[in-house]
Regions:
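Ala/Thr-enriched low-complexity intrinsically disordered regions
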Residues: 2, 12, 34-36
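Short hydrophobic targeting helices and cationic amphipathic motifs
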Residues: 8-10
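Intrinsic low-complexity/disordered segments
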Residues: 18, 25-28
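N-terminal Rossmann-like NAD(P) cofactor-binding subdomain of oxidoreductases
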Residues: 24-26, 37-170
Length: 170
């Protein structure tokens, strides 16, 4: 359970956007605690929902971080299209192809997953196996509201992972 709580770094912010400072702190802390042959390595980042509004902002912020390496631009709408073809302002900055946003596969390939998705998606995908492999920073309200009945009334959907709410960091 302690391992689960350590890896459950779900954070959300007002209106679905997280604070830029927190993003930098997450990457900075992970980088500081990561050594490979006395050399610190880049933190591999995957973004689920990279082509939405919050996802675009997240890409822009992370591209400016010296220790973050975006290895997956997850998008259900633009699979196999270059991120820079979808967003011309990213020409020569983000030329990787958009991939399906499969959280299970992504958890094996990255150090941290950011989810920039509508309410309900992250809660429907996250499970203990994923949380034991990777840190997750969720931009939605899935783990922000601690009272499940308030969440369900406000968003009009059933919360799919209420067991993780008390462990989530907000």
């Amino acid at each position: 359970m302690a391992k689960l709580m350590e890896n459950l770094s779900l954070l959300t912010g007002e209106d679905g956007l997280i604070y830029m400072q927190y993003i930098f702190e997450v990457i900075q802390r992970m980088h500081k605690n990561t050594k490979t042959d006395r050399v610190r390595r880049m933190i591999k980042v995957g973004i689920i929902g990279a082509t939405g509004y919050a996802g675009q902002e997240l890409v822009r912020i992370l591209l400016g971080h010296k220790y973050a390496q975006i290895v997956c631009y997850g998008s259900r709408s633009y699979i196999d299209k270059k991120y820079s073809d979808v967003f011309g302002n990213m020409f020569r900055l983000a030329d990787s192809k958009c991939l399906d946003d499969n959280m299970e596969e992504l958890a094996d390939a990255v150090d941290v997953i950011f989810t920039a998705t509508p309410q309900g998606l992250c809660a429907g995908l996250v499970n203990e196996d994923i949380l034991n492999k990777v840190k997750i920073v969720d931009l939605s309200a899935d783990f922000r509201i601690k009272d499940v009945s308030v969440y369900e009334k406000w968003y009009g959907i059933t919360h799919k992972s209420p067991q993780f709410i008390n462990e989530a960091v907000y």
